């Protein structure tokens, strides 16, 4: 029962704090009241010179408030800012595109210059691949001949090479 009362008290305090925080902030967000500084509230015991100086003070405050009531942004300033942001982003994009084109041109020159200047490494590579494949094929053919000779019982007298291991080492 004691924990239930504590929980209820906690909920009540939370609700009251929310309510109090909203009501204390409420005057900041509501519409201005009909009573303005320019509206006179007559009070007793005030003489005429006091009211004149009071009126001048009220007029100064109203002018200051009228200036502060207008929004603090300037449309031309926002337009200039938007133009500046656009120009900055656009120049970054153009810089990236030009860098990309320059890199592609360098890559194209490098590839084309290697082929036109030095065709020998390409020929050497293709020759090496051919030689490797040909050597592999010869070894496979030698293995087939040797296996056929063993399976069929043929010997070197019929024209087979007795030096099979030497053929594989070539």
UniProtKB/Swiss-Prot annotation:
Q: Which family does it belong to?
A: Belongs to the glucagon family.
Q: Which residues carry this modification: Phosphoserine?
A: 76
- Lineage of the organism: Eukaryota, Metazoa, Chordata, Craniata, Vertebrata
Against InterPro entries, the record matches this protein to: Glucagon_GIP_secretin_VIP, VIP/GHRH-like
Mind telling me which PANTHER family this protein's record contains? GLUCAGON-FAMILY NEUROPEPTIDE (PTHR11213), VIP PEPTIDES (PTHR11213:SF5)
- One Pfam family named in its UniProt record: Hormone_2
GO molecular function terms listed in the Swiss-Prot or TrEMBL record: hormone activity; neuropeptide hormone activity; peptide hormone receptor binding; type 1 vasoactive intestinal polypeptide receptor binding; type 2 vasoactive intestinal polypeptide receptor binding
What is this protein's function? Answer: PHM-27 and PHV-42 are two bioactive forms from proteolysis of the same precursor protein, that cause vasodilation. PHM-27 is a potent agonist of the calcitonin receptor CALCR, with similar efficacy as calcitonin.
Q: Which gene encodes it?
A: VIP
Which keywords annotate this record? Amidation, Cleavage on pair of basic residues, Hormone, Phosphoprotein, Secreted, Signal
Q: Which residues are recorded as modified (Methionine amide)?
A: 107
UniProt-annotated location(s): Secreted
Residue numbers bearing the Asparagine amide modification: 152
Q: Name one GO biological process term.
A: mRNA stabilization
Q: Where is the signal peptide?
A: 1-20
- GO cellular component annotations, sorted alphabetically? extracellular region; extracellular space; neuron projection
Propeptide residues, per UniProt?
A: 21-79, 156-170
Q: Does the keyword Secreted apply?
A: yes
This protein is called what?
VIP peptides
